[in-house]
Amino acid sequence: MGINLVRKLLHKGHEVVSFDTQPFDYPERDLVEHVMGDIREKDALALAMRGSDWVVHAAAALPLNSDEEIYSVDIDGTRNVIEAAVSLGIKRFVHISSTAVYGVPKIGGMKEDSPLVGVGPYGKAKIEAEGIVAGFRDKVAATVIRPKSFIGPERLGVFSLLYDWASLGLHFPIPGHGNNLYQYLDVEDLCDAIYLALTCESSIANDTYNVGAREFGSFRSDFQAVLDRAGFGKKVRGFPVGPVLGILRLLDKLGWSPLYPWVYETAVKDSFVSIDRAVEKLKWSPQFSNSEALIRNYDWYVSHKADFSAQSGTTHRVPWKQGALGVAKIFFR
């Protein structure tokens, strides 16, 4: 998400400082002050923030990392970021959380005051991090944004599995019939929400907001839109929920799959949140439907596939290793 937000801020005429563990190797590198560092390094963090008016905290260790890394980055790191922001007199703070804080949904349409049930270390850490941020709201206008899984240019991660299979002309397997409603979010719409939170009245900013696509279809129909875009005439194929989830749980336990519990457990549930608060208070209006966002991301993947064909990792910047799931390709030609 970082580079997409950087581009938006530059387009709006702002000076931008990027603080990241990875080099800033984008075409805009000469337009941005980049500081390499880790949010667990307090001195480097404070140095990078000095002189800024706004801070957007989007750093996180994702579920493929170790439990220790997740808790260290997502909890301790968040505390460091907001403490530094307050000590330096930052005027506006935005924390990017996740709708994973709601856990595996029993019903769709969760609102910001719905119960929080973290699944796994990542979900639990996100809940605790939100609490840390909320504890500083008397000192800085602090927005917590809970996005649905967001996609778009420069974003890959788990969605690289779908795009890879689609681009190779393969059918794509899913657990169950796939008729459950499932909401995503385009990264451009997320950046719009962040910018609104940075520029609105402080009383409005000092709140928590769900953000997701306004228009979304079923799990099956939106994935099928990507296969249709690929143009090979392939289909999304559903398989019995029990056996598929059993296999995915086993592969996850053995470390042979990039899919973690929140991904595969929610894949068979209605998973969407209410965006009414963001629409009404932030005056946010998402542009992209699920299928539009997925197709936009797929098109970007295809046009840049050669650039990251030899890359993989545990961040959203690169494809994730498919593990045993990659072997299954031979059955879906």
PLM feature segments, named:
Residues 1-54, 58:
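N-terminal Rossmann/SDR dinucleotide-binding element
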Residues 36-76, 84, 99-104:
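NAD(P)H-binding glycine-rich loop region in Rossmannoid oxidoreductase-like domains
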Residues 76, 80-122, 143:
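Conserved Rossmann-fold NAD(P)-dependent oxidoreductase catalytic core, especially the SDR/UDP-sugar
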Residues 80, 128, 155-161, 176-198, ...:
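Substrate-positioning beta->alpha
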Residues 103, 143-161:
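Flexible, glycine-rich beta-alpha linker
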Residues 117-146:
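Active-site Tyr-X1-5-Lys
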Residues 152, 174-180, 207-217, 227-231, ...:
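Glycine-rich Rossmann NAD(P)(H)-binding loop
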Residues 200-259, 275, 291, 295-296, ...:
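Mid/C-terminal beta-alpha module of Rossmann-like enzyme folds, strongest
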